[in-house]
Structure formats: structure tokens, C-alpha cells
């Protein structure tokens, strides 16, 4: 396995040797029929292993299932190798039943740190969650949301009238962020994309690229009249008043890709699609 650090740098050989055991392969599948069939076939070949005691976990499904698996295994140190048995497979490798062990040993690894969201709801209740793709804020009613944006304690935009706003990681920059006309960020870049969703005022503001070390604070103006929900990947908190977002440096997940099809290569290719 070619092991890469969180910014695409190779890890020292001393750190690679302890991670080379990939004998115990666990399989997890989405509810898609194709994923369930693949699970049955691969477990007949390789056996049934508990994901929490495996050397590597193979996720069968699409990107949604891959994200769920990443959340389950965050900070366990167990590498995840996705094979596409779903509709969207940006984070997945091609599906094949043959030579799986050889593919795993030849795979390249990317380490990803999530964002941590701390949302304070009306009434004072707080809820935290992590996001590998993005944290997004979305209006709950027909009226536009009004949001104040602060970065590292400094107010950068006093009032943004919009349908919402999102903060995306390089991994998530090709997902919802791209659909909202945000920039694609190279994997390994020390950056985050702050992208408005259907901004009404200021109409010409197209977002910002900020350091991944930044602390972003989003305050909801007129929260009673213009309620807003915050979403970290798949977890939603409704009626928020403030949302604090920063990179979670204490947690990470390891993703495996076939040689020549690394996450960095996929992000680069995405920028030349029309």
C-alpha cells in the first residue's frame, strides 16, 4: 500500500510497516440489491469478519454508503476500500470479485480529517456532529435566510440573504458545493470552500476560499421569523441560532484507491468535465 498523509505526503517507512496487514477483510453493504448480492459473493470467498476487528473494510454501494462507513469507522485506524455497487461512485473503486487481496495491497491511501460542527438551537440546546463533505445551512421556510459570517472571530459579511450557505472540504468540494457553483479544491490543499446557496444580497458575492485552519461562525439573523437548519453530511439540526465550524484535527479516516485512480486524480478529472 502507498500510504499518504493528510496533505498527500508519504508517511515514513516506519509508520507503513505496522499498517501493511490486510488479511482480515470485512465487507459492509448498502441496501441496494446489487450491493447485497456482492456482499454474499465476497463473503463466500473471503469469509465473514467483524468490521471493528478487521484489517480493512470493503464498502459495497455508492458514495452515500461510503460516507456512512466513514462515519462508523472514523478514528479506528481501519482503512476503507469502496467498490461501486450504487448510483454515484466518486469515492468508490470499480467493482470486481477477482484479485481483491492484490488490489488492496497495491492501493493508495488518503487520510481525511472531517469538519466539526457545533450548532446552538433556539432555546440554547447544543448539538455537535462531524462532516467529511460539507456543513450546510438551509432556510426552513419560504423566506430567505439572513446569516452573519465571521471567520476567526472577525465579521466578514454582516448580512447574507440567501437560501443557505455551506462550508466544504476538498473531498466535498465536488459534491453539493459544485452544484452550488462553488470551487473545486485539490485534495491535500489546506483550504475550505465557503459557498452561498442562491444568494440574493449581496448578489455578486460568490463565496470565499479560506484556510482549513480557520474557525467559521455563522449567526442566524431574525431566527424566529427566518428559521434555518444546519446539516453535517446527513445529520440535521433545525431552528439553529449559531453554527461553529472548524476542522477536527483529532479525528481522521483512511480511504484506499486503486493506483492511477486516487482521490486527487478524480478531483482533477472532475474539473475538465462538461
Each model region followed by its residue ranges:
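ATP/NTP phosphate-donor binding region
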Residues: 2-4, 15-60, 66-75, 95-111, ...
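Short, low-complexity intrinsically disordered segments enriched in A/P/G/S/L with frequent Arg
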Residues: 5, 9-11
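A generic structural signal for short beta-strands and their flanking turns/coil linkers
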Residues: 56, 111-115, 131-133, 143-147, ...
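Short glycine-rich anion-binding loops that position phosphate/pyrophosphate groups of nucleotides
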Residues: 62-65, 86-88, 171-174
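Proline-centered loop/turn at the N-terminus of a beta-strand
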Residues: 77-79
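Catalytic core of DAGKc-family lipid kinases
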Residues: 88-164
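ATP/nucleoside-binding phosphotransfer catalytic cores, i.e., glycine-rich phosphate-binding loops
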Residues: 129, 137, 142, 152-157, ...
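Gly/Ser/Thr-rich active-site loops/lids in small-molecule metabolic enzymes
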Residues: 159-162, 166-203
Amino acid at each position: 500500500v502507498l500510504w499518504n498523509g493528510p496533505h498527500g505526503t508519504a508517511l515514513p517507512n516506519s509508520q507503513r510497516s505496522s499498517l501493511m496487514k490486510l488479511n482480515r477483510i470485512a465487507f459492509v453493504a448498502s441496501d441496494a440489491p446489487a450491493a447485497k448480492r456482492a456482499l454474499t459473493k465476497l463473503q463466500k470467498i473471503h469469509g465473514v469478519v467483524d468490521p471493528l476487528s478487521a484489517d480493512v473494510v470493503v464498502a459495497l454501494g455508492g458514495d452515500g454508503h461510503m460516507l456512512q462507513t466513514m462515519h462508523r469507522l472514523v478514528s479506528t485506524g481501519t482503512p476503507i476500500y469502496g467498490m461501486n455497487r450504487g448510483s454515484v461512485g466518486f469515492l468508490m473503486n470499480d467493482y470486481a470479485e477477482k484479485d481483491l487481496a492484490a488490489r488492496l495491497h497495491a492501493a493508495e491511501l488518503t487520510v481525511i480529517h472531517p469538519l466539526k460542527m457545533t450548532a446552538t438551537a433556539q432555546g440554547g440546546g447544543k448539538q455537535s456532529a462531524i462532516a467529511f463533505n460539507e456543513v450546510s445551512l438551509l432556510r426552513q421556510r419560504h423566506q430567505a435566510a439572513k446569516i452573519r459570517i465571521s471567520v476567526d472571530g472577525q465579521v466578514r459579511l454582516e448580512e447574507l440573504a440567501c437560501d443557505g450557505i455551506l462550508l466544504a472540504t476538498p473531498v466535498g468540494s465536488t459534491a453539493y458545493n459544485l452544484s452550488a457553483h462553488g470551487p473545486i479544491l485539490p485534495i491535500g490543499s489546506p483550504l475550505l470552500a465557503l459557498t452561498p446557496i442562491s444568494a440574493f444580497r449581496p448578489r455578486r458575492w460568490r463565496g470565499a476560499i479560506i484556510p482549513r485552519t480557520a474557525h467559521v461562525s455563522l449567526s442566524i439573523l431574525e431566527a424566529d421569523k427566518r428559521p434555518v437548519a444546519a446539516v453535517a453530511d446527513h445529520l440535521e439540526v433545525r431552528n439553529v441560532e449559531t453554527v461553529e465550524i472548524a476542522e477536527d484535527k483529532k479525528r481522521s479516516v483512511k480511504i484506499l484507491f486503486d493506483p492511477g485512480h486516487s482521490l486527487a486524480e478524480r478531483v482533477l478529472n472532475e474539473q475538465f468535465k462538461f
